[in-house]
């Protein structure tokens, strides 16, 4: 059953790589270029998963309540720090895995420091700090429980909001983008060459995220997609050799790497690229902040931003805007401010 995690990861890695589904870029572009198309795509993926999740619960296929007590202080700090980290690293947790599979050496560095700090925050010297901050919580888990309503009201609201913005974007006049003459035909062209629409990728990601629930639960792991915990588990296993760290999630993240590599290689996008020393140092620092932030917040942009939001936990919906805010702060100091200073000098 653990191998279903590998299959799920391969599919997710392939779709994210071919669809260029970058959550860091999603958050950053909302501020830097005032483009929210990819954020609408993220909402679409959340919505697809949310509808399916509560349907599976309704018919008895899933009998889980994955939300934890809301560790508000750790979530607020962690999500903000994580948002800063993903800009410096050049990709979120999943994005770092799939960019590493494309041959980006900076992402290799970010991935290593992210995995290392995630492990240190769990069972290493910073474990006590993490536990202390996470222990400051309130017994409020899901938004619908807090307000005493059916989760279907929130599903309906999310669906309406998402449908409105999807329709709004699809109603805009399409802009033809210049493209090279296709070298492939048929299925090969569609899979490895044709540019994927973000909303198409989002639906696929939502379906994969939904499928992850019963597949993961069948192995005793009561959660869906998750990146930070499994990434830490790999590091802990390599250090201790203890097989208890190997679970469905570990196979998932390894599958993401494999699927991304397949997508990059087949589409001629794989190339080992060595950045300058400054970029490597920035990537390493970004990975450190990602590991610290995601562990404190109880999840990354996938665990919190895609999965926890789908079942309407307080953790998910509080961490999402804070991750975005952290991304915007980092984007200001690394992109906006340098551009303004350059323009001021030129004038």
Question: What do the predicted segments below correspond to?
Answer:
Residues 1-347:
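Membrane-interfacial helix-loop segments of redox and metal-homeostasis proteins
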